[in-house]
Amino acid sequence: MKTVFYESRIAKLFTFISGFKTIMLFGLIFTEHQSLSKTVLAHEKVHQQQYQDCFGAGLALAIIIMFTLFAFSIQSLWMLLLVLLPIFLYYIVYGTEYLISFVYRSFKHKHLVMANDSAYCSSAMEMEAYDLQEEWRKPCKDRRIHHSFEWFKYYGVI
């Protein structure tokens, strides 16, 4: 399945504010460029794998919640919202982490642009992606790869 879309209008729509030209949305990579460097592609593929991790965790969580509610005979239409949990869990985690970091850093830096840049760079998911994006240059036996939820280890580094 095609996962990278070049010269994408979707990328232009979502990246016009940030200054970036490539974005990963719902497990697909969209870019304004005609081609991507291996470094940028590796960075975005780490985000793809993080999205897949969160999707699987969200699916498991939604199933557990659904069976628990059925066990107690609690059923209503709002349970259909649980279908959205796997799809949006990555963005919920990423956004929550970013907002907490941004608020903290806006008090620390007193300058919103610096707080924004600092909050973005100190995101655990971004830290893992930046850490692994150069691994493609190493010989195969020396490469580190993404492991499920390995980005949790970056919470102690922030």
Stretches found by the model and what they are:
Residues 2-12, 58-158:
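Metalloprotease/metallohydrolase-associated module, dominated by Zn2+-dependent proteases
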Residues 16-42, 52:
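Short pre-active-site segment immediately N-terminal to the catalytic Zn-binding motif
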Residues 19, 44-45, 63-66:
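Surface-exposed beta-strand edges and their flanking turn/coil or helix-capping segments
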Residues 20-22, 46, 133:
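Generic hydrophobic/packing signal
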Residues 34, 48-52, 75, 133:
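Residue-identity detector for glutamine
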Residues 45-61:
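Catalytic Zn2+-binding segment of zinc metalloproteases
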